[in-house]
Amino acid sequence: MSDYIYPIIAGVIAGIATRLYMLKTDYRQYPTYVHGKVIHIALGLIAAGLGAIIMPALLQEEFTAITFLTLAATQFRDVRNMERNTLTQMDSYELVSRGSTYIEGIAIAFESRNYIVIFTALLTTSAYVFLSIWAAVIAAVVCFLLAMKFMSGSVLKDIVDIEYIKPRFDGPGLFVDNIYMMNIGLPEKQELILKHGMGFILTPKNFNSAATIANLGQRQAILFDVSNVLGVYRDSGEPSLTPIAKRDLNDGRVAVFVLPQIHHPETAVQIISNVPTLENAIRMPTEFIKNQDKVIG
């Protein structure tokens, strides 16, 4: 195995560099705490080490070393459970919660990124062993670019058009455009809502998009991201000041009502545009319709 020290080191470096990039903190601010980052960096190092030794172990016919991959898979599933449990507990103390769909998406991402690290380390080490160090560098760069692609994902601006609409009252009823949001009877609460509230209409670009934004978890993710960046003008025990998203049953549009501390509609539109499309919320009913048409045809 001493002949493979440099390939293994190259694979570990490529894997941990990829994990560090994928660990960057954005406006959603998770993970924010240093100890949480240390945990994920340590797991990334383990994943990189496992990926780097796969090819040398196979070439040396050390097949028992491959069994450690099963232990790694179990460990990374535990990471997913850890993230889910931690975020669920944290969510109960948020003024505007993430929602279980958003939390599950984050947990899946943290598990899957460890597998990306294993793949990066494996490919880099293999390129070094069979070709050269320059081939290993190219392999590492390709894996890094793939990681960037996986990090970006799809966002709401890809599936909806977003328009700012000032909230209004019709009697006690709060409306965003022509979509009824909720009933507010107290005049002082109505005044606060008109002063601080913002409304947005999300118009789906196709039928699949309409089915996706109808998901309650996807709507909650929108409310959380806007409130997380711009703040929220409310405290616990004030249901009349709760951000809400409601759907127009006729055309599939979604109205979003928020009460931010910072009243800046243009920034809010940018935030909503960059809300991730949650994997568990994506629906593609037209694919079923197309397949049914093929069967019938």
UniProtKB/Swiss-Prot annotation:
Q: Where in the cell is it found?
A: Cell membrane
Any single GO CC term annotated in Swiss-Prot or TrEMBL for this entry: plasma membrane
This protein's UniProt keywords = Cell membrane, Membrane, Transmembrane, Transmembrane helix
Q: Source organism's superkingdom?
A: Bacteria
Give the membrane topology: Multi-pass membrane protein
Name the residues that span the membrane. 3-23, 38-58, 103-123, 128-148
Q: What is its main location?
A: membrane
Q: What is the protein's given name?
A: Uncharacterized protein YphB
| Taxonomic source organism | Bacillus subtilis (strain 168)
Q: Which gene encodes it?
A: yphB
